[in-house]
């Protein structure tokens, strides 16, 4: 039962990540003066800071797409070289998109409260991902896998944020800028808490499985 739930959760996570990543391709039209599905708040940020904003918006989906496959034990075992190279691409995408996000957070449409939240997310995203990469280089694979869980929890904020936007409208907020002061925190803090709970439970199960 537990394995089935875990498998279904992985499938749901992958599908949501793929959907958001593909939807983000609409930002590629912005340099050509087209704004498909891009609201005025986001458009304003892109028009004011096109390079840093588009770097974040077009590179982050790469990490979002790659991430779920890095957690598949069968892929790691059968194709270790592919796992390593896709992991390098993931790390590079997180760092580049994180730097773009950090630079853009300074001018968040939701003001300084939103800017601080998104800036903190970017700093943690870069730091945790680089820590996971360093652990892999040092062959500390248990720590590497733990930090990669937290890294992808931060990456997955792109999905969580979009899932929460309809809630904002239901609560009476009239646009993204009005919601972003709380989305800047609720998009990623619950993800981190969920990973912390999951990792602690996994550690307890592993300890119980060790014969006395």
PLM regions: where:
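Alpha-helical membrane insertion/targeting regions
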Residues: 1-212
């Amino acid at each position: 039962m537990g394995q089935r739930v875990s498998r279904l959760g992985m499938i749901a996570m992958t599908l949501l990540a793929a959907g958001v990543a593909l939807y983000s391709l609409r930002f590629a039209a912005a340099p050509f003066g087209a704004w498909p599905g891009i609201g005025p708040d986001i458009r304003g940020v892109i028009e004011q800071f096109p390079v840093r904003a588009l770097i974040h918006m077009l590179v982050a989906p790469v990490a979002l797409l790659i991430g779920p496959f890095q957690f598949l034990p069968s892929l790691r075992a059968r194709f270790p070289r592919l796992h390593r190279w896709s992991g390098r691409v993931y790390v590079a995408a997180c760092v580049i998109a994180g730097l773009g996000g950090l630079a853009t957070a300074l001018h968040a449409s939701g003001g300084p409260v939103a800017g601080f939240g998104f800036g903190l997310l970017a700093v943690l995203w870069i730091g945790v991902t680089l820590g996971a990469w360093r652990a892999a280089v040092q062959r500390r694979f248990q720590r590497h896998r733990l930090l990669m869980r937290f890294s992808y929890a931060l990456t997955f904020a792109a999905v969580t944020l979009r899932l929460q936007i309809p809630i904002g409208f239901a609560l009476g907020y009239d646009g993204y800028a009005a919601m972003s002061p709380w989305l800047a925190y609720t998009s990623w803090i619950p993800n981190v808490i969920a990973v912390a709970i999951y990792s602690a439970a996994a550690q307890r199960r592993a300890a119980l499985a060790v014969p006395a």
